[in-house]
């Protein structure tokens, strides 16, 4: 008789079977895939022994495509169909891309994309999600060939600043590439894991991540295997590409040469990148580029490069200062600084970071590989291969989330820099008598007025039982999952009617917009407080006028003529103040006058209600 084999829930029937899980760093300039093999995390090479995959895809006529090194080599002769730095376009609309005129691509807003941009290529219209999926699929095939096995799943890293739309676009790309996505984790968290900071490390660490397209700074607190991201910051207009552009522009000014065609611009940009990389190892390099049919040559010294790019380096340190201030951490409290991203190889950057923090940064791991290695370690644990090494990762929300309330005010539900995953709820009520539906507008930002924040989603809760204004209790719950994606639910407590929405905006906030919104929030805090006070006073006054008029319509006959006239005059005065005054105190004073002037009326209404309730009843019945 055969026996049924029953394994522990969630475990493989074969205790010796190991699931293959990978970590992927989907980067702006290069992408990598890593995995844990024989207990050691390592980046997986291609057939030629190269671990870096250029994040470049070239589309050919007839549906063909080239990916990686082959595509990168074609940038000079076919820039319009060779897509690089696609990470900058993920989850974004046409209006979000600055300097479009300097890029060789034909951007369009596809009719079925919900506002997300696409690119017109020789192989048809391609979205950034599709381009990223080509890169992810190439890395997936590399991993499958390396292990000669199917993959259990993947952890993919994203910048800490990525918003809902950008994270969702990354998840969509993973799905399109045939990957089982185990988790999205923030790049600085992955870097900290790679450095082994989970192995008993305690204290505050900073992760300085200067990649090809963006700069991110994160402050983490480590305690007994718990990774808590205290604060994040950055600058989306700052990366290795911007150092290249600054050097290229300076050389063009020095030589008097102008690059006008897409081919010339690409030639100058690639020459600047090669010059920058060479200056990492030597003090003097010849800048060489073909422009307008002629060869341009110019000697560049390391000190020239440092002077030309000094403003960019200082911008990164300004973002570091803001983030430390958000975290309420002094720079001397930082126990260690982790460098991430190929651009941190620049001596000028390393020297500036060391001077700022007063300590040499951690550089013993390859800055190009550190994020992928950390993702691989996390993937290995999520696959159940290293149960003893479980980590608790606490990432944060970059901007506050809330809903619109009466008067166009924002009521924050989840605050900026709160750890995720999280769920928070708050009760709201109706504004008018008999209201049976509630419109819920979800917004993101630090300002007090809806018009100054970013709209994320709208939905309606219908079927609310008719009640007096303020009687209904609607609980609104915000839930942010471990990938940083938001869902919102609204439930009327008495009837149980419920509505919910997964917030998937067609495109979202750029890092630059997040930084700008934070700066505006700080700069206008006093003004916002005054505006909010005025709006709240006006909403309260309107509610008082509605309630008073409703009471007069029902029980106005209990008033003497003089009493009715006095109340009418107070109501008229309050309406006049609402129409003419922008002073919250004046509105509050007029509303208080009406409230005080109707106290006797309220007492008379209560007496009438009591008499009506007692009518026809004797003492024994009571």
Curated annotation (Swiss-Prot):
<dbReference type="InterPro" id="IPR029048">
    <property type="entry name" value="HSP70_C_sf"/>
</dbReference>
<dbReference type="Pfam" id="PF00012">
    <property type="entry name" value="HSP70"/>
</dbReference>
<dbReference type="InterPro" id="IPR018181">
    <property type="entry name" value="Heat_shock_70_CS"/>
</dbReference>
<keyword id="KW-0143">Chaperone</keyword>
<keyword id="KW-0067">ATP-binding</keyword>
<dbReference type="GO" id="GO:0016887">
    <property type="term" value="F:ATP hydrolysis activity"/>
</dbReference>
<comment type="function">
    <text>Chaperone involved in the maturation of iron-sulfur cluster-containing proteins. Has a low intrinsic ATPase activity which is markedly stimulated by HscB.</text>
</comment>
<dbReference type="GO" id="GO:0051082">
    <property type="term" value="F:unfolded protein binding"/>
</dbReference>
<dbReference type="GO" id="GO:0016226">
    <property type="term" value="P:iron-sulfur cluster assembly"/>
</dbReference>
<dbReference type="GO" id="GO:0005524">
    <property type="term" value="F:ATP binding"/>
</dbReference>
<dbReference type="InterPro" id="IPR029047">
    <property type="entry name" value="HSP70_peptide-bd_sf"/>
</dbReference>
<comment type="similarity">
    <text>Belongs to the heat shock protein 70 family.</text>
</comment>
<dbReference type="InterPro" id="IPR010236">
    <property type="entry name" value="ISC_FeS_clus_asmbl_HscA"/>
</dbReference>
<dbReference type="InterPro" id="IPR013126">
    <property type="entry name" value="Hsp_70_fam"/>
</dbReference>
<protein>
    <recommendedName>
        <fullName>Chaperone protein HscA homolog</fullName>
    </recommendedName>
</protein>
<dbReference type="GO" id="GO:0140662">
    <property type="term" value="F:ATP-dependent protein folding chaperone"/>
</dbReference>
<keyword id="KW-0547">Nucleotide-binding</keyword>
<dbReference type="InterPro" id="IPR043129">
    <property type="entry name" value="ATPase_NBD"/>
</dbReference>
